[in-house]
Curated annotation (Swiss-Prot):
Gene that encodes the chain: miaB
Listed name of the protein: tRNA-2-methylthio-N(6)-dimethylallyladenosine synthase
Domain TRAM, first and last residues per copy: 378-441
Transmembrane domains' residue ranges: none
Molecular function terms from GO: 4 iron, 4 sulfur cluster binding; metal ion binding; N6-isopentenyladenosine methylthiotransferase activity
Native source species: Shigella sonnei (strain Ss046)
MTTase N-terminal domain ranges (all copies): 3-120
Length: 474
C-alpha cells in the first residue's frame, strides 16, 4: 500500500522551495506520495513562517487539528519545520507533546533519518542546528513541475534588521558553490524549464565558490545562468539595497534573459525609521539605485516591501514613505502593519503607534500602490507582450494562462501545445488582477536561441569527484 505525505506550507518562496525538496526527498528515500488530504497521510509536515503576527499561535492551532488525527491513528508521524520550529525548538513539544519531529530550515535533509528514528523507537527528534550548506548535498536531483522553477542559491542573512527573525531562524549567509547551482539549473532546463527564479533571503549577497576556487559575485552568476541553453528568463528574490551594486545593474544593460521586473524591499521612506530598522541605507540611496537601473533598463518595473506603524513612526515619517512610493512609481508591494517578532531588537521598542492609525496608514499605502499598478497595466493595453505559457487559465479551462516579464497574469485562447513555450500576445483588456489578450506569434516564429540542448550541456560539463558525486564545470 502506498504511503502518503501531507505538507502544509506557510510563508515565503523559500519555504515553498523547501517543501518541494522535502517531498522529493521522502519520495526518493521512503516512497511517500504527496496528498492534499491530511486525513489520508502517514506523515504530516508543517513548514512554518515566523514573519506574520501571532505566528506561534497559528502553529499550535494547526497542530491541535492534527492531534485529533493522531488520536485516531497513533502511528501517524507529525513534524514541524521552518522558522517557527527553529525559533521555538523543544518548546513546541512542551505545548504539543504529540509532535514527533522538530526540524529547522537547515536540517530538512535529515528527515529520512528522523522518520526512521521515530518509526524505530518512537522517540521524538529535535534538530534545529545550522549545518551550513550540507542540506544541498543531500537532496535528490531536481524535478521540474512546469516551465518555471525556483532554485535556492544561498541561505540566511547577515543584515540583522531590527524587526526581522531570519538571521536567528535560518542562520547567517551561506552561499552555494556556482557549479552546484548551474548544474541544478541545467538539469531543470533539460526537463523543459524556461524560467528560473533564484532564491535567497538576501540573494544579491551571493558570494559562492567557483570551480577554480575563486569567489564569484552575484553579477557573475547571473551571466552564467543566462548562458545555459533553454533558460530564457531569469528572476531573483529577495534583494537588499545595500548590496545592489553597479555590476548587477550592468547585467540589466547587457543580459536580456534577466526580466524587466525587480522586487527590491525598502520598508520605509523615512531615513529616521530606516535607521531604527537597521537598514543601513537612506531613501536617497535607494532612489539612486532605481535611477541607475532605469538608465540601464528603461522599461523596468519595481515592487517593494513596506512596514507601516514601526515604533516611533510619525505622520511625517509616513508621508515620506508615501512620497517615495510616488517618486519611484512602484508597480506593486507587499505591505504589512508592524508587529513585534519575539527575540528581535524591535520587540524591545515602545510600540507607540495606535492600532487604528496603523490600519489607516496601511489602507492609504495599499490604495496608492493599487492605483499605480493599475496605471502600469493600462499602459500595456494594445501592446504586444511575450508570455511564458504556464498552463490552463484559472478563469476558464478553455483558455491558457501565462505571465509577462513584469509578472502580469495574461489569459488568452490557445492550443495545448503552447504550454511550456513562449507566445506573443496583444493585450486587449485590463483587469485589476490580470490581463486578457490574443496570440499574434508562436514560439516557432520567434527564432529563439537554441544553440545547444540542455542535455548536451549536462553531458559535456558533468564531472564527478572521488566519491562519484556529480558537479558542473564550465
Amino acid at each position: 500500500m502506498t504511503k502518503k505525505l501531507h505538507i502544509k506550507t506557510w510563508g515565503c518562496q523559500m519555504n515553498e522551495y523547501d517543501s518541494s525538496k522535502m517531498a522529493d526527498l521522502l519520495d526518493a528515500t521512503h516512497g511517500y506520495q504527496l496528498t492534499d488530504v491530511a486525513e489520508e497521510a502517514d506523515v504530516l509536515l508543517l513548514n512554518t513562517c515566523s514573519i506574520r503576527e501571532k505566528a506561534q499561535e497559528k502553529v499550535f492551532h494547526q497542530l491541535g487539528r492534527w492531534k485529533l488525527l493522531k488520536e485516531k491513528n497513533p502511528d501517524l508521524i507529525i513534524g514541524v519545520g521552518g522558522c517557527v520550529a527553529s525559533q521555538e525548538g523543544e518548546h513546541i513539544r512542551q505545548r504539543a507533546h504529540y509532535v514527533d519531529i522538530i526540524f529547522g530550515p537547515q536540517t530538512l535533509h535529515r528527515l529520512p533519518e528522523m522518520i526512521n528514528s521515530v518509526r524505530g523507537d518512537r522517540s521524538p527528534v529535535v534538530d534545529i542546528s545550522f549545518p551550513e550548506i550540507e542540506k544541498f548535498d543531500r537532496l535528490p536531483e531536481p524535478r521540474a513541475e512546469g516551465p518555471t522553477a525556483f532554485v535556492s542559491i544561498m541561505e540566511g542573512c547577515n543584515k540583522y534588521c531590527t524587526y526581522c527573525v531570519v538571521p536567528y531562524t535560518r542562520g547567517e549567509e551561506v552561499s552555494r558553490p556556482s557549479d552546484d547551482i548551474l548544474f541544478e539549473i541545467a538539469q531543470l532546463a533539460a526537463q523543459g524549464v524556461r524560467e528560473v527564479n533564484l532564491l535567497g533571503q538576501n540573494v544579491n549577497a551571493w558570494r559562492g565558490e567557483n570551480y577554480d576556487g575563486s569567489t564569484g559575485s552575484f553579477a557573475d552568476l547571473l551571466r552564467l545562468v543566462a548562458a545555459i541553453d533553454g533558460i530564457d528568463r531569469i528572476r531573483f528574490t529577495t534583494s537588499h539595497p545595500i548590496e545592489f551594486t553597479d555590476d548587477i545593474i550592468e547585467v540589466y544593460r547587457d543580459t536580456p534573459e534577466l526580466v524587466s521586473f525587480l522586487h527590491l524591499p525598502v520598508q520605509s521612506g523615512s531615513d529616521r525609521i530606516l535607521n531604527l530598522m537597521g537598514r543601513t541605507h537612506t531613501a536617497l540611496e535607494y532612489k539612486a539605485i532605481i535611477r541607475k537601473l532605469r538608465a540601464a533598463r528603461p522599461d523596468i518595473q519595481i515592487s517593494s516591501d513596506f512596514i507601516v506603524g514601526f515604533p516611533g513612526e510619525t505622520t511625517e515619517d509616513f508621508e515620506k514613505t508615501m512620497k517615495l512610493i510616488a517618486d519611484v512609481n512602484f508597480d506593486m508591494s507587499y505591505s504589512f502593519i508592524f508587529s513585534a517578532r519575539p527575540g528581535t531588537p524591535a520587540a524591545d521598542m515602545v510600540d507607540d503607534v495606535p492600532e487604528e492609525e496603523k490600519k489607516q496608514r496601511l489602507y492609504i499605502l495599499q490604495e496608492r500602490i493599487n492605483q499605480q499598478a493599475m496605471a502600469w497595466s493600462r499602459r500595456m493595453l494594445g501592446t504586444t507582450q511575450r508570455i511564458l505559457v504556464e498552463g490552463t487559465s484559472r478563469k476558464s479551462i478553455m483558455e491558457l494562462s501565462g505571465r509577462t516579464e513584469n509578472n502580469r497574469v495574461v489569459n488568452f485562447e490557445g492550443t495545448p501545445d503552447m504550454i511550456g513555450k513562449f507566445v506573443d500576445v496583444e493585450i486587449t483588456d485590463v483587469y485589476p488582477n490580470s490581463l486578457r489578450g490574443k496570440v499574434v506569434r508562436t514560439e516557432d516564429e520567434m527564432g529563439l536561441r537554441v544553440a545547444e540542448t540542455p542535455e548536451s550541456v549536462i553531458a559535456r560539463t558533468r564531472k564527478e569527484n572521488d566519491l562519484g558525486v556529480g558537479y558542473y564545470q564550465p
